[in-house]
Amino acid sequence: SPHLTKLGADLTIKIGNYMNLDPFLGESIQGQKYEEGEFYKSHWDYYHPLSAEYKTYCEWMGQRTWTFMIYLNDVEEGGETYFKFLDLKIKPEPGLAIFWNNLYSFGWPNFKTMHEALPPTKGKKYILTKWYRAWSLI
């Protein structure tokens, strides 16, 4: 739909401007929905340099450098984003945006950004996520 395409383009530009990042470095915006009990296990958004995934996913756009995530709704219970090494739980609130650097400025992975999506225990959780890469195809 042309309206959805324009919305995606507008969001891409706004997020890029907010983070002071070139919009062309970003992957497509993705939406996620978590039903009660659904979760996403602990992970990093970067690809480990020694993994098979690194060659597959980083060869053409480089490593994931930044993550931007925005919560779209309140969750009655649960649904926090938990950063294990920071001992930080972030409760979903509509419009709350969080972002983090997946790499240090010298290029090494930032292990402190390991995070997980805890399951909503009452209600659903909706988020939008955008990842930024080291370089662009354009």
Placement of each model-derived feature along the sequence:
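Fe(II)/2-oxoglutarate oxygenase catalytic core
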Residues: 1-99, 103-138
